[in-house]
Amino acid sequence: MDKVFDYEDIQLIPAKCIVDSRSECDPTVELGGFTFRLPVVPANMQTIIDEKVALMLAKNGYFYIMHRFNPETRLAFIQDMHERGLYASISVGVKDEEYGFIEVLKSTGHTPEFITIDIAHGHSNAVIRMIQHIKHHLPGSFVIAGNVGTPEAVRELEHAGADATKVGIGPGKVCITKIKTGFGTGGWQLAALRWCAKAATKPIIADGGIRTHGDIAKSIRFGASMVMIGSLFAGHDESPGETFEQDGKQLKEYFGSASEFQKGERKNVEGKKMFVEHKGALQDTLTEMEQDLQSAISYAGGDSLEALRTVDYVMVKNSIFNGDKVY
C-alpha cells in the first residue's frame, strides 16, 4: 500500500476556465439507465431518509436509496413509487428472510429499479450469495453491493454480478467501527476510493467521510460515480427524527446504522448518536451542493463532471483549512 491520504490532505489544482458562467456546467450523472441531477445520494440511514424524503428526491430528479430498517413496509413502498410513475430504490440485508423477500418481489411482479445490499462488511460470501440470488430472480434490478474497502472486494462483488460497489468502512461521522474493531477506511477513505476505483470496471459509490461540498468533487476526481453522504444531509426540516431545543438552538438527532439507537439494543454496536444543528430545507442544501459542484467543474476547466476526473492535485498534509471552519 503506498502513501495514504484523506479529503483534507488533497487540494485540486485549477485549469483554464472554458465557460462564461458556472451555470453552464452540468453536474448530472447517469446511473442504472437514469440521469440524476447530482452525483450525490443521501445515506440510507433512518435519521436521513424516509418515504417522504425518498418521494421528494425521486420527484425532483435526485438519486435516493431507502433504508432497510422497516422491512415490512418495503413492498408497499415499491408499489407506491411505481404507481406515482417514479423509480423504486430499496435496501436489503443478507439474513434468511431477505431471500424470501426477493422471491416475493419476483412473484408479485414488483421489480425495484435499484437494490442496495447494505451490510457493514460487504466482502463476504453472504453478500456474494445475495447478489447471485437477486440477479437470478430480478435480473432487471440494478444491484449496488457493499460496503467494501479493497480492490479484491470490488473485483469479487463485480464478478458475482454487482452493477456497482459501495466503498467505505467506518469513515462516517456517526460510525465507530474504526474505534471498536481497529479496522476500516477512516482517515484514508479518499485513498481507499482511489485504490478501489483502479480495480473497478463498474460504477463506485463513495460512502462516508464527506464533510464539505468540495469533498464531493474530490471523490469524483478519485473515481467515484456517486457519493453517499450522511451528516451533511442530517438535521433538515424533512429529516426523520425528533427536533428539540437546547441553549436556544434547534437540534436534530443523527445516529449510525449499527448504533444501539437504531438496533434498539446494545449488541455489536458500531455506531453512535449525535445532535446536529437544524439546517432548514433539504432543497436549499441540494441547490447549494449543485452550485458548488458547478463551480468545481468550472475550476477543473470543463463543463461536465468528466472534467473533474483528470485534474491535477497536490497533497497538503492537513493544512488546507488553516483553522478555518466553514461548516
Swiss-Prot record:
Keywords: NADP, Oxidoreductase. This is GMP reductase. One of its GO terms (biological process) is purine nucleotide metabolic process. It comes from the Bacteria. GO terms for molecular function: GMP reductase activity. SMART domains: IMPDH. InterPro entries: Aldolase_TIM (IPR013785), GMP_reductase (IPR050139), GuaC_type_2 (IPR005994), IMP_DH/GMP_Rdtase_CS (IPR015875), IMP_DH_GMPRt (IPR001093). The active site is at C175 (thioimidate intermediate). One of its GO terms (cellular component) is GMP reductase complex. SUPFAM superfamilies: Inosine monophosphate dehydrogenase (IMPDH) (SSF51412). Belongs to the IMPDH/GMPR family. GuaC type 2 subfamily. PANTHER family: GMP REDUCTASE. NADP(+) binds at residues 204-227. NCBIfam families: GMP_reduct_2, PRK05458.1. It catalyses: IMP + NH4(+) + NADP(+) = GMP + NADPH + 2 H(+). Catalyzes the irreversible NADPH-dependent deamination of GMP to IMP. It functions in the conversion of nucleobase, nucleoside and nucleotide derivatives of G to A nucleotides, and in maintaining the intracellular balance of A and G nucleotides. Pfam families: IMPDH. Its EC number is 1.7.1.7. It comes from Exiguobacterium sp. (strain ATCC BAA-1283 / AT1b).
